[in-house]
Amino acid sequence: MEEKAPLLLTIAVLGGTGKEGKGLAFRWARAGYKVVIGSRIPEKAVTAASEIIELLEGSSSVVGASNLEAAEQAEIVVLTVPYAAHRDTLEGVKDALKGKLLIDVTVPLVPPKVSKVQMPPAGSAAQEAKAILGEDVQVVAAFQNISHEHLMTDSDVECDVLVTGSSKEARTEAIKLVEAAGLTGWDAGPIENSVVVEGLTSVLI
């Protein structure tokens, strides 16, 4: 079992009612972090939070809120929405992210079979996030290649997470969260390298 993190640090998981977001929220709540699940529909976020608390037998601090409210309450924000909602979600929480760390899990997969990626003009979803948010937000890309099925278990998982980001400091902070989730994090360099990691997702699927 991981060392418990102080409950002073709050992580918001935007789009946290989806499988990937819920799995990450479960992992961090299990490790002792305070977690706020965000959603376009706050009621769904509240339900997801209740389900996680039940899985952890009530021994966690998890609440549900709108995406904006979740972003406002957290020091670290994790974005787990489908690519179709990527830009709109970021625009909606942009002001709340200033001075914070954003971990972008989004991959620009082409629906419905999601067997290929279509990179945006910015280069990758993470680079697009950086372009939208500007210099006031540290942006990191991570967790794109981890199955939600591995996350919703009560044990460590032998999975590697490649972490790319806008600064060494931001990548180091993100790797701490990777390890808190029971995974192994690797510094994969600057955010421009996120195009490689995002592109790998469709191959693994």
Residue locations for each model-derived region?
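NAD(P)+-binding Rossmann beta1-loop-alpha1 motif at the extreme N-terminus of oxidoreductases
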Residues: 2-54
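Phosphate-coordination loops involved in phosphoryl transfer and adenosine-cofactor binding
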Residues: 7-10, 99, 158
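Active-site phosphate/pyrophosphate- and oxyanion-stabilizing loops and adjacent acidic/basic residues
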Residues: 50, 91, 127, 131
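Rossmann-like NAD(P)-binding element
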Residues: 56-61, 66-101, 105-113
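Short beta->alpha connector loops
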Residues: 82-85, 145-146, 167-168
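Rossmann-fold NAD(P)-binding glycine/threonine-rich loop
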Residues: 106-153
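Internal alpha-helical scaffold of NAD(P)-dependent oxidoreductase catalytic cores
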Residues: 132-142, 156-194, 198-203
